[in-house]
Curated annotation (Swiss-Prot):
Gene of this entry: UBR1
Source organism phylogeny: Eukaryota, Metazoa, Chordata, Craniata, Vertebrata
Organism: Homo sapiens
Compartments in which it is found: Cytoplasm, Cytosol
Protein name (Swiss-Prot/TrEMBL): E3 ubiquitin-protein ligase UBR1
Pfam families: ClpS, PRT6_C, UBR1-like_wing, zf-UBR
Family per similarity comment: Belongs to the E3 ubiquitin-protein ligase UBR1-like family.
Residues involved in a peptide binding: 148, 150, 153
Residues noted as binding Zn(2+) 4 in the record, renumbered to the chain: 1098, 1101, 1164, 1167
Any single GO BP term: proteasome-mediated ubiquitin-dependent protein catabolic process
Length: 1749
């Protein structure tokens, strides 16, 4: 590519005709008559030269050239003097009061729920932080890009429109309309320059020619250089484009990726340069290759190099204009004027309109810059914003059509600017009045959807394009924006234009009324489910718009009546087929109704009735205004035809009933989904609720008997009630019963649901409270669940916060879960079992919960309806449904069928509903009688329910009979309540006046209460008797249990573990009394090993087996992992592969360790192998993403599903007992000096033996060791025994586990013969113990009293495995490793690579030395090991030597800069410390100061050595089985130290060790301290590790989440200069912010591409890490390259809930408890486990590509 570029036409020199300096050029321009021509001439000469190298540009040089030769002269010409000085003056002349920041994609925006006019009013981060809204109920969201900060816009905020920086009165701030201090000359120059600049920018941006420039720019000799330019589209994926480029251009992957990234970012890129023919060929190749992978070819053009240059510069010139306009309002106004000016002799529109109309054809980069120009000019000046909006509306239809045909995102379309104009209240009014914008938008909708209209002119979205329809929603959104602020003042013109828009909107609703009609499928099931999503989605989009239109209409009574008339007309027009069709007559109880012969089960029916529902909404608002009485003025009674209005909503409710009755099951899932959404919170407000209201309107205006006849007819139940149906078809009976239930339920809703302002006398707050009460009657709920179940208004508000505390109390969350609201007891009285927003499941659950609660409170289980509020006058006649003849007949029929034992045409649910209707009628009559004299009450429900009439029994008598039916025991309480209510109403009826009636009513109520009290007392007595009976039985069971335990006491004494004790275990396992033995682990006084018979059960085959060394192996499932949990230097460079690594010595900073954890579940080795093979086989057959890496030996524990990658063989502890006489005798002989001499003699002997071999032990001895070789066998004289013989099965498992540790610890292929295998075994033992000790210390738990079962079992198995592992290796190898370890602590021996004392972790040395030491007893002919007494001394002296070395480590690195606050008194330990420190100070040649107080040294030593002692105690306990002192099971810091010393055979004054061994240790001290490497370490104090090591924790996070967002907003990608959307991710281990999921920051690891987070995790956490995605508030756990999972973030809102993705946007604050839990997941090494568990529960066919995170 570079060669081709260089081979093009030679660059032209800048013309000598033009002046060379900016000042002279400015002067020359001033002398020209026509600036535009002169300017273009200048550009024609320079631009192609500057932007010559398009393929590989030198961006810095380009910018420098364009600045010097074009922008600086322009600025000189504009200001007439040095532009830098002028711009600086303008900069300091004051900040503009409008912020105007344009949001980038991914940027955080803030809105205030208290003050914003609507949710589109947002602030940028900086303005928000300095505003009053920070302390309000704000919301945080992530911008999709292209938005605008509204700080300073007084129309956007109710209060606090300005932040501190943009406050008008503040010094340095200027008002919107004030003028910057520009002199007239500058303004004149601007009027010359700006039109020319804008015209050039527009002309070049929309230039279509590929080969030729405009004539005025063709002054150079034309070259033959072209570019093949590839454009971005949304049809092709990244990979498609890369593939096409690789094939067409024959280029490398990296080059293709570079091109693709640039195309995605900028929208286009030159991918080839050269002659026209070559570029044309490349174009055709790219198109053909891209067609192979997609139906659409890529958009490619061949452009002349000069066209490319000018187009690129035009955009750069646009950015320059942006900069200039930011300095002055005058500049902005001149720019706007120039953009809006129409050319006199041209048919073209003004420049800004031309840009708008060309927007859809522009590429991404051009669009962005031009939109920014609009933001920084028109939108910063209110007057010109209005003019721009008028131009926008003028071309609105064309712009939207082009957007719908386009494939680019909405955020980079000119149509996205609508929100900036339509949501400004004054501007919206102006556009409605002057340009009829509502009609424009609605007409646009009709014009873009004609393809979806059927022959009846109704929408039918079958086979719709999801993408296209998704773009249509943008037009619907604009309608919402224009209506979002209701006008407070109505002018005649506004009223007229709004009505015009409303009529236009009704046309859309007419096309939706009855759309997508369906017919019941009979015979066979439908073959293909029809599309239903589009129609429901449009219904959802229109929900708030419908409500807003209704609210706008309700602002003005006249307007509302006219709108009602128009809507009524539209409904009638859609109902012509119903009006003209044939009729049928329905009769019952002497009443008849003539209606259309229509059956929902046979004829066409639609769920979409927006016109009818809008009319219902307008009717309710008429009722609210009290204007229903005027309705006849606009719609005559003859034309009203209420039956027609009721018809379609009633059909819809019948359809729902029949779906419930499974009559439509052959119509498939499509209908079920529609019915679900019809009643769901997202749609119900403008669907289901409005249908109920329309039926209430019908009931209020029709004769009640005729209304019920219509209902019976449509439910197809008229015959079911008129005659007894004799059928044995159980399905048909079930169908009838379901339909009757559904009908009764709807009747309950019509009569009882009055919580709609305008239907009942209620407020919006009362409606919301009732919704909340009924939700919380189901169960306590979190805030988000309540909000999710409440309908939102146009501002996305539910009204929840205003009322929730009146009806519920908040219960705070624990460490997991979320906070919930619980209903207050006083709100329970408002529970209505037949609440119309309950689903079937919710209804059942609520009924169950309330009955259960009443039972617990010893109350009856009756759940009568609460007294309903009064109907509004317009709906007052609805109650006549209750006492009409047909209703009484329906109720009587239901009760009679229930009494008839042969009848099966009733259900208990049906009876419940009938009782509910009875209760409603009685409550209504009772309320009326209590409010008015008896003679004024015409509602006679009691009379009609208690009269006999034509039947033998009245309803009251039927109830008495029902009460005695055993099957209805559950309804007895409700029947009792109704009968009592009958009695109450009867008494009220018997009184002749209101006062007496009220008194009588209260007396009857008192009688009711007495009856209730008696029943309550009876219930309480029964409950108490039952409780005593249970207590008696429990006591008998307890006595039997104790008797059994006493009888079988022996068995219980021998039980090793108490079942069910998961969280902690007791270490004393069937031990003798404390006085029986010594609790000392080391030396001659060592206590006995506590061992027991261990019988374990395999979780796979459930067979038991005793653990013995000669038996087949049993294993624990385990997971080995690399860990940085203890590191003292986070991010220390790591070798990704350990081919050359020597892991014998661990660095003291514990940078990378190998941790072994186990879930504690036991299997036979054979069973595990079979299980693993089965897992491998099933994994090969699965199509899901692999959950684990089988090649690495991974599997899920069969029981707990923890991720494992190996097994630990369970090897029993070999009992060891020391003969006290032998020990005492040996104590006299085996001093430390003698022991060292013996060990050195043995090593020396081995060295001589191997001297002739190939691999001698690489050591050298100090002088004086010559004779020691004669004592080669003397080590055996202190006690030996035969080595343990393990079964082959155990050996195999030992080798397998050791090889796994080696493979994972070093990241190398498995090799069981590698000499480093034993090193890794010792290392994982040491590191695992250190990690567990660190965790216990971090949690403040005792060393032995708080170990979890799995930790206890895992450590026990790990230590015994380590003992056995030595035997599976060549002993010569172990000896070599041992000698290297001993060279650190033995005075007369030093290996060539012996490390400096300060550069090793001595606990690792201790573990390695102890486990390797028995190898010294091995010799060729015999396989021996030390006896118990020998090993007790070996352990004691090794431990003492290494402890002294560690003491020296601590004292050499003591932190002298942090003395303790108070001076401690002198003590023996302090004196010892001072004198010892003075001694070693001499040995280090004064490298450490000796003026540190003794008490400080002693305290530092004690604190520093305690973790080491705790680790040693754990190690020796699990190695030897000696029970530790009781103090180590309790949480006592002071008692712990002395107990540790006692257990480990140490004096509490540790300096006594040196006194005891001084002669032996002194040479060693001198050698250690004189080591040059050690002295060098002491000089580099900043890198030295101090003790105790710091306990790692996750980074400190701010309490307020907005602080983190602020931090992220300032994040700049280290490898990318652009400000495109980034995904800043915070590492919670080290605090680094990374650029995630972006190609710019990908790295190559072992030939594979990995994202920035995965690459960081490899170094920071050895592949395991915790990240916080800042802009999404999501925690992500990752492990390795291909695994990860989401985890609840530690940030909660005030309701105790997380907010992943900031979807709710509530303020978030750090939960310390949650963050602590996350910290423990890390420190317990459970991250891998969490990931595996998450992946197991959330299996996906195609998982997230974690590798590129």
């Amino acid at each position: 590519m570079a060669d081709e570029e260089a081979g093009g036409t030679e660059r032209m020199e800048i013309s000598a005709e033009l002046p060379q300096t900016p000042q002279r050029l400015a002067s020359w321009w001033d002398q020209q008559v026509d600036f535009y021509t002169a300017f273009l001439h200048h550009l024609a000469q320079l631009v192609p030269e500057i932007y010559f190298a398009e393929m590989d540009p030198d961006l810095e040089k380009q910018e420098e050239s364009v600045q010097m030769s074009i922008f600086t002269p322009l600025e000189w010409y504009l200001f007439g003097e040095d532009p830098d000085i002028c711009l600086e003056k303008l900069k300091h002349s004051g900040a503009f009061q409008l912020c105007g920041r344009v949001f980038k994609s991914g940027e955080t925006t803030y809105s205030c729920r208290d003050c914003a006019i609507d949710p589109t009013c947002v602030l940028c981060m900086d303005c928000f932080q300095d505003s009053v809204h920070k302390n309000h109920r704000y919301k945080m969201h992530t911008s999709t890009g292209g938005g605008f900060c509204d700080c300073g816009d007084t129309e956007a905020w109710k209060t606090g429109p300005f932040c501190v920086n943009h406050e008008p009165g503040r010094a340095g701030t200027i008002k919107e309309n004030s003028r910057c201090p520009l002199n007239e000359e500058v303004i004149v120059q601007a009027r010359k320059i700006f039109p020319s600049v804008i015209k050039y920018v527009v002309e070049m941006t929309i230039w279509e020619e590929e080969k030729e420039l405009p004539p005025e720019l063709q002054i150079r000799e034309k070259n033959e250089r072209y570019y093949c330019v590839l454009f971005n589209d949304e049809h092709h994926s990244y990979d498609h484009v890369i593939y096409s480029l690789q094939r067409a251009l024959d280029c490398e992957l990296a080059e293709a990726q570079l091109h693709t990234t640039a195309i995605d970012k900028e929208g286009r890129r030159a991918v080839k340069a050269g002659a026209y023919a070559a570029c044309q060929e490349a174009k055709e190749d790219i198109k053909s290759h891209s067609e192979n992978v997609s139906q659409h070819p890529l958009h490619v053009e061949v452009l002349h190099s000069e066209i490319m240059a000018h187009q690129k510069f035009a955009l750069r010139l646009g950015s320059w204009m942006n900069k200039i306009m930011s300095y002055s309002s005058d500049f902005r106004q001149i720019f706007c004027q120039a953009c809006l000016r129409e050319e006199p002799d041209s048919e073209n529109p003004c420049l800004i309109s031309r840009l708008m109309l060309w927007d859809a054809k522009l590429y991404k980069g051009a669009r962005k810059i031009l939109h920014e120009l609009i933001f920084s000019s028109f939108f910063m000046e209110m007057e010109y914003k209005k003019l721009f909006a008028m131009e926008f509306v003028k071309y609105y239809k064309q712009l939207q059509k082009e957007y719908i045909s386009d494939d680019h995102d909405r955020s980079i379309s000119i149509t996205a600017l609508s929100v900036q104009m339509f949501t400004v209240p004054t501007l919206a009014r102006h556009l409605i009045e002057e340009q009829n914008v509502i009609s424009v938008i609605t007409e646009t909708l009709l014009e873009v959807l004609p393809e979806y209209l059927d022959r009846n002119n109704k929408f039918n979205f079958q086979g719709y394009s999801q993408d296209k329809l998704g773009r249509v929603y943008a037009v619907i959104c604009d309608l919402k924006y224009i209506l979002i602020s209701k006008p407070t003042i109505w002018t005649e013109r506004l009223r007229m234009q709004f009505l015009e828009g409303f009529r236009s909107f009704l046309k859309i609703l007419t096309c939706m009324q009855g759309m997508e009609e369906i017919r019941r499928q009979v015979g066979q099931h439908i073959e293909v489910d029809p599309d239903w999503e589009a129609a429901i989605a449009i219904q959802m989009q229109l929900k708030n718009i419908l409500l807003m239109f209704q609210e706008w209409c309700a602002c003005d009574e006249e307007l509302l009546l006219v709108a009602y008339k128009e809507c009524h007309k539209a409904v009638m027009r859609c109902s012509t087929s119903f009006i003209s069709s044939s009729k049928t007559v329905v009769q019952s109880c002497g009443h008849s109704l003539e209606t259309k012969s229509y059956r929902v089960s046979e004829d066409l029916v639609s769920i979409h009735l927006p016109l009818s529902r809008t009319l219902a909404g307008l009717h309710v608002r008429l009722s609210r205004l009290g204007a229903v009485s005027r309705l006849h003025e606009f719609v005559s009674f003859e034309d009203f035809q209420v039956e027609v209005l009721v018809e379609y909503p009633l059909r819809c409710l019948v359809l729902v009933a029949q779906v419930v009755a499974e009559m439509w099951r052959r119509n498939g899932l499509s209908l079920i989904s529609q019915v679900f959404y019809y009643q769901d919170v997202k749609c119900r407000e403008e669907m289901y609720d409005k249908d109920i209201i329309m039926l209430q309107i019908g009931a209020s205006l029709m004769d009640p008997n005729k209304f019920l006849l219509l209902v019976l007819q449509r439910y197809e139940l008229a015959e079911a009630f008129n005659k007894t149906i004799s059928t044995k078809d159980q399905d048909l009976i079930k169908q009838y019963n379901t339909l009757i239930e559904e009908m009764l339920q709807v009747l309950i809703y019509i009569v009882g649901e009055r919580y709609v302002p305008g239907v009942g006398n209620v407020t919006k707050e009362e409606v919301t409270m009732r919704e909340i009460i009924h939700l919380l009657c189901i169960e306590p709920m979190p805030h988000s669940a309540i909000a999710k179940n409440l309908p939102e208004n146009e501002n996305n508000e539910t009204g929840l916060e205003n009322v929730i505390n009146k009806v519920a109390t908040f219960k705070k969350p624990g460490v997991s879960g979320h906070g919930v609201y619980e209903l207050k007891d006083e709100s329970l009285k408002d529970f209505n079992m037949y609440f119309y927003h309950y689903s079937k499941t919710q209804h059942s659950k609520a009924e169950h919960m309330q009955k259960k609660r009443r039972k617990q409170e010893n109350k009856d289980e009756a759940l009568p309806p609460p007294p309903p509020p009064e109907f509004c006058p317009a709906f007052s006649k609805v109650i006549n449904l209750l006492n009409c003849d047909i209703m009484m007949y329906i109720l009587r029929t239901v009760f009679e069928r229930a009494i008839d034992t042969d009848s099966n045409l009733w259900t208990e649910g049906m009876l419940q509903m009938a009782f509910h209707i009875l209760a409603l009628g009685l409550l209504e009559e009772k309320q009326q009688l209590q409010k008015a004299p008896e003679e004024e009450v015409t509602f006679d429900f009691y009379h009609k329910a208690s009269r006999l009439g034509s039947s033998a029994m009245n309803i009251q008598m039927l109830l008495e009979k029902l009460k005695g039916i055993p099957q209805l025991e559950g309804q007895k309480d409700m029947i009792t309540w109704i009968l009592q209510m009958f009695d109450t109403v009867k008494r009220l009826r018997e009184k002749s006046c209101l006062i007496v009636a009220t008194t009588s009513g209260s007396e009857s109520i008192k009688n009711d209460e007495i009856t209730h009290d008696k029943e309550k007392a009876e219930r309480k007595r029964k409950a108490e008797a039952a409780r005593l009976h249970r207590q008696k039985i429990m006591a008998q069971m307890s006595a039997l249990q104790k008797n059994f335990i006493e009888t079988h006491k022996l068995m219980y004494d021998n039980t090793s573990e108490m079942p069910g004790k998961e969280d902690s275990i007791m270490e004393e396992e069937s031990t003798p009394a404390v006085s029986d033995y010594s609790r000392i682990a080391l030396g001659p006084k060592r206590g006995p090993s506590v061992t027991e018979k261990e019988v374990l059960t395999c979780i796979l085959c459930q067979e038991e087996q005793e653990v013995k060394i000669e038996n087949n192996a049993m294993v624990l499932s385990a997971c080995v992992q690399k860990s940085t949990a203890l590191t003292q230097h986070r991010g220390k460079p790591i070798e990704l592969s350990g081919e050359a690594l020597d892991p014998l010595f661990m660095d003291p900073d514990l940078a990378y360790g190998t941790y072994t954890g186990s879930c504690g579940h036991v299997m036979h080795a054979v069973c595990w192998q079979k299980y693993f093979e089965a897992v491998q086989l099933s994994s090969q057959q699965r199509i899901h993403v692999d959950l684990f890496d089988l090649e690495s030996g991974e599997y899920l524990c069969p029981l707990c599903k923890s991720l494992c990658n190996t097994v630990i063989p369970i090897i029993p502890l070999q009992p060891q007992k020391i003969n006290s006489e032998n020990a005492d005798a040996l104590a006299q002989l085996l001093t430390l000096a003698r022991w060292i001499q013996t060990v050195l003699a043995r090593i020396s002997g081995y060295n001589i033996r191997h001297a002739k071999g190939e691999n001698p032990i690489p050591i050298f001895f100090n002088q004086g060791m010559g004779d020691s070789t004669l004592e080669f066998h003397s080590i055996l004289s202190f006690g030996v025994e035969s080595s343990i013989k393990y079964s082959n099965s155990i050996k195999e498992m030992v080798i397998l586990f050791a090889t796994t540790i080696y493979r994972i610890g070093l990241k190398v292929p498995p090799d069981e013969r590698d000499p480093r295998v034993p090193m890794l075994t010792w290392s994982t033992c040491a590191f695992t113990i250190q990690a567990i000790e660190n965790l216990l210390g971090d949690e403040g738990k005792p060393l032995f009293g708080a170990l979890q079962n799995r930790q206890h079992n895992g450590l026990k198995a790990l230590m015994q495995f380590a003992v056995a592992q030595r035997i599976t290796c060549p002993q010569v190898l172990i000896q070599k490793h041992l000698v290297r370890l001993l060279s650190v602590v033995l005075p007369n021996i030093k290996s060539e690579d012996t490390p400096c004392l300060l550069s090793i972790d001595l606990f690792h040395v201790l573990v390695g030395a102890v486990l390797a030491f028995p190898s010294l007893y091995w010799d060729d002919p015999v396989d021996l090991q030390p006896s118990s007494v020998s090993s007790s001394y070996n352990h004691l002296y090794l431990f003492h030597l290494i402890t002294m070395a560690h003491m020296l480590q601590i004292l050499l690195t003591v932190d002298t800069g942090l003395p303790l606050a108070q001076v401690q008194e002198d003590s023996e330990e302090a004196h010892s410390a001072s004198s010892f420190f003075a001694e070693i100070s001499q040995y280090t040649s004064g490298s450490i100061g000796c003026d540190i107080p003794g008490w400080y040294l002693w305290v530092s030593l004690k604190n520093g050595i305690t973790p080491y002692l705790r680790c040693a105690a754990l190690f020796f306990h699990y190695l030897l089985g000696v029970t530790p002192p009781e103090e180590l099971h309790t949480n006592s810091a002071e008692g712990e130290y002395s107990a540790l010393c006692s257990y480990l055979s140490l004096p509490t004054n540790l300096f006594l060790l040196f006194q005891e061994y001084w002669d032996t240790v002194r040479p060693l001290l001198q050698r250690w301290c004189a080591d040059p490497a050690l002295l060098n370490c002491l000089k580099q104090k900043n890198t030295v590790v101090r003790y105790p090591r710091k306990r790692n924790s996750l980074i400190e996070l701010p309490d307020d989440y907005s602080c983190l967002l602020n931090q992220a907003s300032h994040f700049r990608c280290p490898r990318s200069a652009d400000d495109e959307r980034k995904h800043p991710v915070l590492c919670l281990f080290c605090g680094a912010i990374l650029c995630s999921q972006n190609i710019c920051c990908q790295e190559i690891v072992n030939g594979e591409e990995v994202g920035a987070c995965i690459f960081h995790a490899l170094h920071c956490g050895a592949g395991v890490c915790i990240f916080l995605k800042i802009r999404e508030c999501r925690v992500v756990l990752v492990e390795g390259k291909a695994r990860g999972c989401a985890y609840p973030a530690p940030y909660l809102d005030e309701y105790g809930e997380t907010d992943p993705g900031l979807k709710r946007g509530n303020p978030l604050h750090l939960s310390r408890e949650r963050y602590r839990k996350l910290h423990l997941v890390w420190q317990q090494h459970c991250i891998i486990e969490e990931i595996a568990r998450s992946q197991e529960t959330n299996q996906m066919l195609f998982g997230f590509n974690w590798q590129l995170l």
